[in-house]
């Protein structure tokens, strides 16, 4: 009995021993695997990846292509050159290959050569664009984005148009304003810089921009800017003056045609014998002969006797003893008569629409007063 009782007691530990040993062995295996992985991570963390070469991918590709005797390489040959030259491309990191492919396809300085017959599939040769070789001379690897040359070529016309907007080469060869007896022709090179800038500022309206009247439409500029341009204009004298008012413009005669004898007359005979008048106080009147349909004797005049004699007062104010006229043209008339002065709103559009036929469209004004002044002849 004792032996039978002892046998189960001996067998029970034998059956229970494998159950107790298994839980003890499994944690040991897990800890060993985790310790090996951490050791591997520690060893990998200690090893640093080689430093990237201090060149852009464009420069690296150019180095590879220029190293070839034929100046062309395939994509795989470019990979081999970079891996043999720089340790950075030998590691486990493979993202640089995508960068090489993108730079080859996205930059215009690289050209994909067409493959010959009998070579299907991959393996295209890449070379450097001959127009872009200057970018990489003497080791100067300058990055140029896609479409750089197109942008440079597109900027050239815009710069040219901007320079034209400032008044350079802005006027065509001639402006012909047909009036009663002829036309006005102004060369394009005589436009001053101030008048060109005034055109851009919008002081001259529509069709009157080419006549160079910047001195009469821009109070902030000196009047010699307009006269310097009109002084170089040449006009064809007409045979007769039309039957309308002659106060259209101090620079033009009654028919819209500049008299060549009236531009910059430097003799003293062009000045009136009467003492100089003053325009500062607005009390004196300028004498002028009326040319109206009511006066038939004044309707036709010879071109040799010009109605207006234009003179710049700032050039002759010391010789003639006048200090009140500052940059305002003076006039000499054959038979002076009293004229009235009226205020009006200065408008170039009215002058162009009426072709300078209305008596109220005068092109000069007195700047010292608030409103512009018009010197008009009395209609008899």
From Swiss-Prot:
Subcellular location: Nucleus
Keyword line: DNA-binding, Nucleus
Bias kind Polar residues: ranges: 1-19
Region described as Disordered: 1-49
Main subcellular location: nucleus
One Gene Ontology CC term in the entry: nucleus
GO molecular function: DNA-binding transcription factor activity, RNA polymerase II-specific; RNA polymerase II cis-regulatory region sequence-specific DNA binding
InterPro entries given in the database record: Fork_head_dom, Forkhead_box_regulator, TF_fork_head_CS_1, TF_fork_head_CS_2, WH-like_DNA-bd_sf, WH_DNA-bd_sf
Protein name: Forkhead box protein F1
Organism lineage string: Eukaryota, Metazoa, Chordata, Craniata, Vertebrata
């Amino acid at each position: 009995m004792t032996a039978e009782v002892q046998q189960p007691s001996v067998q029970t530990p034998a059956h229970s021993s494998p159950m107790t040993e298994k839980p003890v062995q499994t944690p040991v295996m897990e800890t060993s695997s985790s310790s090996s992985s951490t050791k591997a991570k520690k060893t990998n963390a200690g090893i640093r990846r080689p430093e990237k070469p201090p060149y852009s991918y464009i420069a690296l590709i150019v180095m590879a292509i220029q190293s070839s005797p034929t100046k062309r390489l395939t994509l795989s040959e470019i990979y081999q050159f970079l891996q043999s030259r720089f340790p950075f491309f030998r590691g486990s990191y493979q993202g640089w290959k995508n960068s090489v492919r993108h730079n080859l396809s996205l930059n215009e300085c690289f050209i994909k050569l067409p493959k010959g017959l009998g070579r299907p599939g991959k393996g295209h040769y890449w070379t450097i664009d001959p127009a872009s070789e200057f970018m990489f001379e003497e080791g100067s690897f300058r990055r140029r984005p896609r479409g750089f040359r197109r942008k440079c070529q597109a900027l050239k016309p815009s710069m040219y148009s901007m320079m034209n907007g400032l008044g350079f080469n802005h006027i065509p060869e001639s402006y012909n304003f047909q009036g009663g007896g002829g036309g006005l022709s102004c060369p394009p090179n005589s436009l001053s810089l101030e008048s060109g800038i005034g055109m851009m500022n919008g002081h001259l309206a529509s069709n009157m921009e080419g006549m160079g009247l910047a001195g009469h439409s821009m109070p902030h500029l000196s009047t010699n800017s307009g006269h310097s341009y009109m002084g170089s204009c040449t006009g064809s004298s007409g045979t007769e003056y039309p039957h309308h008012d002659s106060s259209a413009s101090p620079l033009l005669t009654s028919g819209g045609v500049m008299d060549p004898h009236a531009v910059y007359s430097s003799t003293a005979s062009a000045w009136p014998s009467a003492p100089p008048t003053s325009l500062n106080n607005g009390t004196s009147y300028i004498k002028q002969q009326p040319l109206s349909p009511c006066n038939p004797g004044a309707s036709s005049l010879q071109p040799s006797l010009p109605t207006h004699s234009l003179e710049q007062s700032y050039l002759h104010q010391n010789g003639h003893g006048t200090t009140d006229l500052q940059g305002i043209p003076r006039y000499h008339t054959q038979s002076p008569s009293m004229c009235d002065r009226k205020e009006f709103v200065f408008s170039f559009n009215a002058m162009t629409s009426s072709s300078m036929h209305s008596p109220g469209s005068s092109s000069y004004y007195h700047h010292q007063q608030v409103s512009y002044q018009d010197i008009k002849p009395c209609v008899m």
